[in-house]
From Swiss-Prot:
Gene: TY1A-OL
GO biological process terms held by the UniProt record: viral translational frameshifting
Name recorded for this polypeptide: Transposon Ty1-OL Gag polyprotein
Domain characteristics, as noted in the entry: The C-terminal RNA-binding region of CA is sufficient for all its nucleocapsid-like chaperone activities.
Composition-biased stretches (Low complexity): 153-165, 402-418
Compositionally biased region (Basic and acidic residues): 429-440
Keywords linked to the UniProt accession: Cytoplasm, Phosphoprotein, RNA-binding, Transposable element
Species: Saccharomyces cerevisiae (strain ATCC 204508 / S288c)
Annotated GO CC locations: cytoplasm
InterPro entries: TYA
Polar residues: compositionally biased ranges: 1-23, 48-60, 127-152, 419-428
Annotated positions of the Phosphoserine modification: S416
First-listed, main subcellular location of the protein, grouped into a coarse class: cytoplasm
Length: 440
């Protein structure tokens, strides 16, 4: 029938006829790969029957002999997605565990290739600056690992040391520059404290409160490599890791020492800017204090030249040392040593003047003895005329008696009286008073 139709229409090309026949065969003979798994048996029976009837269809008869097509899957179903990220960004278990480690559910125990960020743990994109773990890889830090019993020898200690953290612990940001490492390590230490690992952080003396366990060391090693890529580490950190790439504790200890050094630098600058000196302390002690501060700042990279140092020192001088501001302010090339020579000269002059002054202070016992001897030996017996005396009336009576007797005596007695005017007149009374001439 079909050959008759083709002979009736010779203008139709042979290619079009072949295309129509091919399309008809596709519709009549369906490929068993497109059939669901529930109809596999029927497809096999149909293909067997077709093979017995038509020997010219080898494609359909060869399908059931292939063991790989025993349980075909629908071609239209997409592959399942494992986690919140696309399938092409995920890694297989063998790729995630190149060292042969067992696959842990706890994110802290996932082994990482040193200083390499896998797309599985840190997918590209601006959605977050922190690493995010897919649900199929790890659980929150508060959830114990389902395989922890097969991995850790002491699961109770591991739960208390590592998994007894907050449910959501914010990780530190990614290190992006060597200059940001001092600030980054502060956030990393805070992250360890929030993860109940504050006891393993070195203290001021460089020693931790307790001994770190192997599991905690693994957690330290893994998290440090994730959040601090090697290309952004300072040189001194790389030097430590080149000796021992797991010595994260030494890096933390050195970082804490540098933090203390930075605090000391700030204190030295404040002390140098607020210097005060008036000679109350020895000049040697003041010079030692200032030179130690300047040398310490210079060793730490903060250079203080002579001009700035002299200005800061002279700014704090007071008292007799204050005039050094005006005698030396024009000397542009003056050094700190020359300035302290002038300070020493003034201090020695002050000490010499204090030692040369006589000491007029007398002992208290000597003063008491002098006061006693004065009151006992220097009591006056000759008393000058005092109009407030109580016995003034008796003195007047005695004077009147003497005057009357002198008038009644002969003239020879007048000469004796005139001669004795320079001698004190003695009165014979019970008070034993002596009157000087001219006082009455």
């Amino acid at each position: 029938m079909e050959s008759q139709q083709l002979s009736n229409y010779p203008q139709i090309s042979h290619g079009s006829a072949c295309a129509s026949v091919t399309s008809k065969e596709v519709h009549t003979n369906q490929d068993p790969l497109d059939v669901s798994a529930s109809k596999t048996e029927e497809c096999e029976k149909a293909s067997t029957k077709a093979n017995s009837q038509q020997t010219t269809t080898p494609a359909s008869s060869a399908v059931p002999e292939n063991p790989h097509h025993a349980s075909p899957q629908p071609a239209s179903v997409p592959p399942p997605q494992n986690g919140p990220y696309p399938q092409q960004c995920m890694m297989t278990q063998n790729q995630a565990n190149p060292s042969g480690w067992s696959f842990y559910g706890h994110p802290s125990m996932i082994p990482y290739t040193p200083y390499q960020m896998s797309p599985m743990y840190f997918p590209p994109g601006p959605q977050s600056q922190f690493p995010q773990y897919p649900s199929s890889v790890g659980t929150p830090l508060s959830t114990p690992s389902p395989e922890s019993g097969n991995t850790f020898t002491d699961s109770s200690s591991a739960d208390s040391d590592m998994t007894s953290t907050k449910k959501y612990v914010r990780p530190p940001p990614m290190l992006t520059s060597p200059n940001d490492f001092p600030n980054w390590v502060k956030t990393y230490i805070k992250f360890l404290q929030n993860s109940n690992l504050g006891g393993i952080i070195p203290t001021v003396n460089g020693k931790p409160v307790r001994q770190i366990t192997d599991d905690e060391l693994t957690f330290l090693y893994n998290t440090f490599q994730i959040f601090a890529p090697s290309q952004f580490l300072p040189t001194w950190v790389k030097d430590i890791l080149s000796v021992d790439y797991t010595d994260i504790m030494k890096i933390l200890s050195k970082s804490i020492e540098k933090m203390q050094s930075d605090t000391q630098e700030a204190n030295d600058i404040v002390t140098l800017a607020n210097l005060q000196y008036n000679g109350s302390t020895p000049a040697d002690a003041f010079e030692t204090k200032v030179t130690n501060i300047i040398n310490r700042l210079n060793n730490n990279g903060i250079h203080i030249n002579n001009k700035v140092a002299c200005q800061l020192i002279m700014r704090g001088l007071s008292g007799e040392y204050k005039f050094l501001r005006y005698t030396r302010h024009r000397h542009l090339n003056m050094t700190v040593a020359e300035l302290f020579l002038d300070i020493h000269a003034i201090y020695e002059e002050q000490q010499g003047s204090r030692n040369s002054k006589p000491n007029y202070r007398r002992n208290l016992s000597d003063e008491k003895n002098d006061s006693r001897s004065y009151t006992n030996t220097t009591k006056p017996k000759v008393i000058a005329r005092n109009p407030q005396k109580t016995n003034n009336s008796k003195s007047k009576t005695a004077r009147a008696h003497n005057v009357s007797t002198s008038n009644n005596s002969p003239s020879t007695d007048n000469d004796s009286i005139s001669k004795s005017t320079t001698e004190p007149i003695q009165l014979n009374n019970k008070h034993d008073l002596h009157l000087r001439p001219g006082t009455y």
